[in-house]
Amino acid sequence: MAKILVVDDERMICEEFQDILQEDGHEVDSAFNGLEAIEKVKLKEYDLVFLDVLMPRMEGREAFEKIKEVSKVPVAIMSGYIPANKEREILALGAVACFKKPLDLAKVRSLVTQVVNTPKP
């Protein structure tokens, strides 16, 4: 079982993640902006964070950088539109994956399985 944080200003996306991943036996929390995500990561040790790029209050890239300052948690980026150069940039910063919306649930589940089965440093 993995502890997963889903960060997206669209509540429906967070609810879909919760339904699907809880069905698979994972614990799923939601945050609706970057600031809330940072606070949650400070308070709880997650195995994986799915982070939207475009959100109010704090853009995903800034939230990503702040999360990486306080935690070693793997972060997967998701967005409705990610240009190839932006995707390379995000991966170079240390994201474990970039997902385009609508999400491919098989790929999401595959990443969760990979993270769960990877020994922590």
Put a short name on every predicted segment:
Residues K44-F50:
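Active-site beta3 strand of CheY-like receiver
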Residues K42-K44, K66-V73, L93:
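Conserved phosphotransfer cores of two-component systems
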Residues R11-D29:
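Two-component/phosphorelay signaling modules centered on CheY-like receiver
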